[in-house]
């Protein structure tokens, strides 16, 4: 479940802790928000992909392949300007609310309306705050349609959906309940989550520690890990010492000299 985090972690070392928990050391200076629409950098992506579910994802065994996630299948029309996704049934958010096509549509629209870091690639495909409500829609339960605003290779759009990790399903009811002054819940999602992923956020203290616990109702099956802890360390040398002592399982982005 932590394949993407490990894939993008850079220099990584491993030690041993109890088999049902994972302790990860990293420099958390750049971990500024947990909002998928605002995330930048691999550190936050590695966390977000375990709190949320995407429509589709890359196959970690073959990164050129796209595989189902919340969407079980998809097709492109003959005109190659419309992608239709068919959603998996029975998936629930951590709140207990069902994951619906309306949640997926709202989540993608939110990216363009907020116009934060993750909006840039979608704007390059022609999506905008003005047209996204028309171009991204759910014509019926369990169906999500993405209409391309301008000529693009739909295979490239599909790959972007799978690779970027930004188009994840947010629990729209929960987020909207925490909306302040039309911010689409951005302030609340900076330090909270509203996902359906394999892990739930328990707590986060900036530049200190972030705790996750497993989602026992996860649609892919209950994760083997009961707990994941991210701890902040400023210096690479400290990470190396913690690995040597056996206090960390993984140390992210260590300097080459410490590996």
Identify what each model region corresponds to:
Residues 1-9:
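Bacterial N-terminal signal peptides
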Residues 86, 121-177:
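Surface-exposed binding/hinge segments that line
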Residues 73-118, 145-147, 155, 239-245:
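Aromatic- and charge-enriched surface segment that lines or borders ligand/interaction sites
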Residues 19-28, 72, 82-84, 104-108, ...:
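Short, well-ordered beta-strand elements
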Residues 118-121, 202-213, 229-259:
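Extracellular/periplasmic solute-recognition and catalytic clefts
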Residues 25-78, 109, 116, 192-198:
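N-terminal lobe/hinge region of extracytoplasmic solute-binding protein
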């Amino acid at each position: 479940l932590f394949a993407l985090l490990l894939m993008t972690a850079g220099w990584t070392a491993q030690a041993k802790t109890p088999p049902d928990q994972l302790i990860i050391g990293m420099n958390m200076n750049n971990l500024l928000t947990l909002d998928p629409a605002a995330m930048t950098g691999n550190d936050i992506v590695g966390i977000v992909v375990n709190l949320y579910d995407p429509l589709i994802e890359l196959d970690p065994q073959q990164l050129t392949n796209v595989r189902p996630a919340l969407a079980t299948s998809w097709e492109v029309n003959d005109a190659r300007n419309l992608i239709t996704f068919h959603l998996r049934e029975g998936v629930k958010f951590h709140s207990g609310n069902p994951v619906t096509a309306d949640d997926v549509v709202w989540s993608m629209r939110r990216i363009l309306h907020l116009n934060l870091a993750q909006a840039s690639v979608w704007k390059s495909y022609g999506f905008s705050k003005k047209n996204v409500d028309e171009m991204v829609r759910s014509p019926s339960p369990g169906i999500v349609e993405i209409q391309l605003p301008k000529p693009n290779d739909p295979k490239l759009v599909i790959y972007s959906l799978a690779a970027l990790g930004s188009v994840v399903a947010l629990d729209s009811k929960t987020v909207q309940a925490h909306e302040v002054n039309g911010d689409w819940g951005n302030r609340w999602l900076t330090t909270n989550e509203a996902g359906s992923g394999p892990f739930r956020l328990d707590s986060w203290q900036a530049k200190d520690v972030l705790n996750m616990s497993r989602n026992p109702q996860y649609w892919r099956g209950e994760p083997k890990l009961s707990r994941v802890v991210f701890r902040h360390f400023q210096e690479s040398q400290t990470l190396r010492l913690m690995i040597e002592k056996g206090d960390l399982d993984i140390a992210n982005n260590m300097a080459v000299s410490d590996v």
